[in-house]
């Protein structure tokens, strides 16, 4: 296993996981707010 796929000391899979989780959380909060009725105020 080589280390060429990493940027600095942070593995790409960790960056992807964190970014994906944050994106899913934002989408979930947005749809939840829209469902409850607070989405129009964002």
Swiss-Prot record:
What is the protein's given name? Photosystem II reaction center protein J
Pfam families, per this entry?
Answer: PsbJ
Specify the protein's topology with respect to the membrane: Single-pass membrane protein
Per the record, the GO terms for biological process are: photosynthesis
Gene Ontology CC terms: chloroplast thylakoid membrane; photosystem II reaction center
Q: How does it assemble?
A: PSII is composed of 1 copy each of membrane proteins PsbA, PsbB, PsbC, PsbD, PsbE, PsbF, PsbH, PsbI, PsbJ, PsbK, PsbL, PsbM, PsbT, PsbX, PsbY, PsbZ, Psb30/Ycf12, at least 3 peripheral proteins of the oxygen-evolving complex and a large number of cofactors. It forms dimeric complexes.
| Keyword Transmembrane helix (UniProt) | yes
Function, as annotated:
One of the components of the core complex of photosystem II (PSII). PSII is a light-driven water:plastoquinone oxidoreductase that uses light energy to abstract electrons from H(2)O, generating O(2) and a proton gradient subsequently used for ATP formation. It consists of a core antenna complex that captures photons, and an electron transfer chain that converts photonic excitation into a charge separation.
Domain of life, source organism: Eukaryota
Keyword Ion transport on entry = no
User: Where would you find this protein in the cell?
Assistant: Plastid, Chloroplast thylakoid membrane
**InterPro entries documented for this protein:** PSII_PsbJ (IPR002682), PSII_PsbJ_sf (IPR037267)
Q: Which cysteines are joined by disulfide bonds?
A: none
Family per record: Belongs to the PsbJ family.
Alphabetical UniProt keywords: Chloroplast, Membrane, Photosynthesis, Photosystem II, Plastid, Reaction center, Thylakoid, Transmembrane, Transmembrane helix
Q: Where are the transmembrane segments?
A: 10-30
